[in-house]
Amino acid sequence: MKVEILCVGTELLLGDILNTNAQFLAKEFGAMGFSMYHQAVVGDNVERLKREFELAINRADIVVTTGGLGPTDDDLTKETAAEYFNKKLIFHKESYDEIVKFFNKIGKEISENNKKQAYFPEGCTILKNDHGTAPGCIIDENDKVVILLPGPPREIIPMFRNYVIPYLRKYQEGTIVSKVLRVCGIGESGAAEMLKDLIDNQTNPTIAPYAKDNEVTFRITAKAESEEVAMKLIEPMERKVRERLKENVYGVGDTSLEDVLGAMLIEKKLTIATAESCTGGLLSGRLINYPGISEVFMEGAVTYSNEAKMNRLGVKKETLESYGAVSSETAAEMAKGIAKTAGTNIGVSTTGVAGPGGGTKEKPVGLVYVGLCINGKVKTRKLNMPGDRQTVRNRVVNAVIDWIRREIINL
């Protein structure tokens, strides 16, 4: 079946808000085995909304809209769908009671306008909103399925997964299951070359690489009569990928690098502290994303100036004068210094030129040195990271987290 996404909202059209809903829905429908050929964004204009809605209905079997279910006069998605199917909007008391309950819970008074959110096209299936005041609905008629969802991602995601996916199961031909392997430390072309025969000869399951910021993902997808059978098809392919890419595969699904490292540090009872210059606390911020990291993360120091490096970390003045702040020698002393002062098993440091200015011929923008002290033994690495200031910093942090992960695998 063909699916089309229609996102409603002037704020999306003008780029004021990033349209993450379309990305989320496209991935979900793809994982379920539906085909998608069109997406559209339309502002809060009723005539243009009607035209786009009719175009979508004529092209697709399933049309999903996001937004336009609010209480204001320009929230007209339900009205547009009801008019197309020649249906009345009917008041649904249970939904209204849930809206009232939501307002009571957050200590706010409900306005008369919010009553509008409890009106739905006659005969539709109502989708409960567990995280907001705008319930969704499904109109399933004349060989067309129209799914109306609210705009906020925090409301769409649980509504889609809890209510829409179960509803659409009857339209799936068999079961499609995907497993995502996350890879870092190797580029998309290099990883794809190592798996070339698997990619070239794929049937069921299929395997597809996707380049993302600082990493690559491989989605393995199988189609079968049941989820259990599909997973059995995926397993041999996953084994082959892992055998070839080895420790470059760091996780599955939505697992992040910091999740993996955090779990390893806790399991191995290894404490860690950070000393950052060019990354300015970004590394420690990533590490503390992992719940429970307080067991092993002792502290993070942002030592931007030479004085801070000397006073806080014990970096020698002679080192800074002879080699400069951006050097392997300084990175080594920073890592050793933070491990010593924090009393941790691991100390890690970053020092470099993030840009856009400050670079020289000898030390250009993107040059970064990182240091790693594990149980008193110090190593350093030289990195050359392309991109703007934020990109350089993000890439350095990813590289450092991955480096620590690889170093402690066999400890």
UniProtKB/Swiss-Prot annotation:
Family: Belongs to the CinA family.
Organism: Clostridium acetobutylicum (strain ATCC 824 / DSM 792 / JCM 1419 / IAM 19013 / LMG 5710 / NBRC 13948 / NRRL B-527 / VKM B-1787 / 2291 / W)
UniProt xrefs under NCBIfam families: cinA_nterm, molyb_syn, PncC_domain, PRK00549.1
A Pfam cross-reference name: CinA_KH
InterPro entries: CinA, CinA-like_C, CinA_C, CinA_KH, Competence-induced_CinA, MoaB/Mog-like_dom_sf, MoaB/Mog_dom
Transmembrane region(s): none
Signal peptide range in chain numbering: none
Gene: cinA
Protein's name in the database: Putative competence-damage inducible protein
CDD domains recorded: cinA
